[in-house]
Amino acid sequence: MSTLRIPIALQQAVMQCLRHYLQLANQHLGTAYPEPKINYHQRGTNAGSAYLQSFEIRLNPVLLLENKQPFIDEVVPHELAHLLVYRQFGRVAPHGKEWRWMMEQVLKVPASRTHQFEVASVRSKTFNYQCKCQQHALTIRRHNKVLRGESEYRCRQCGEKLQFITINPD
């Protein structure tokens, strides 16, 4: 897998945003939380992830390159809020009242759980399966489990075992 190069100006914009919201939080909370580590190794359709114990934020490089400033403005404070909530309150619901409070009252940004970025470029290939009543799209992970005989999947409507038909031409 090749690594995408994130232009230095975009990395600087990420860090500027991170530092802005971290400063807001430290002032509001009366704390001196350190700057989290940022890396650009998030894969799939997730825009970002917060690694609580290592105080690290992973950002999706493809979605960052495609969406630039809107991505930074939405995803960086979202993931930072997860880290701050963990430091402030310990283990709580990921998008619970503490996280919403951190987003809205401390960081002063809307508390949105999911992003609305176009994900066609990062969506994984799916595999068509069918039962008696409909078609189903399985991820490559589930498809491979079927091929190895580790799992079988059944339709929630009719209960029939799903049968492989074709690969989706994504």
UniProtKB/Swiss-Prot annotation:
> Which part of the chain is the SprT-like domain?
22-165
Cofactor(s) needed, names only, are:
Zn(2+)
Q: Does the keyword Cytoplasm apply?
A: yes
PROSITE patterns per the UniProt record, alphabetical = ZINC_PROTEASE
Molecular functions (GO terms):
zinc ion binding
Explain how, and how many, cofactor molecules are bound.
Binds 1 zinc ion.
Catalytic-site annotation from UniProt = E79
Q: Which GO terms describe its biological process?
A: response to stress
Q: Where does Zn(2+) bind?
A: H78, H82
Write out the GO cellular component annotations.
cytoplasm
* Pfam families, A to Z: SprT-like, Zn_ribbon_SprT
Q: Which domain of life is it from?
A: Bacteria
Question: Where in the cell does this protein reside?
Answer: Cytoplasm
UniProt keywords (A-Z) are: Cytoplasm, Metal-binding, Zinc
Family note: Belongs to the SprT family.
HAMAP family per the UniProt record, alphabetical = SprT
Protein known as: Protein SprT
Organism expressing this protein natively: Yersinia pseudotuberculosis serotype O:1b (strain IP 31758)
Give me the gene this protein comes from: sprT
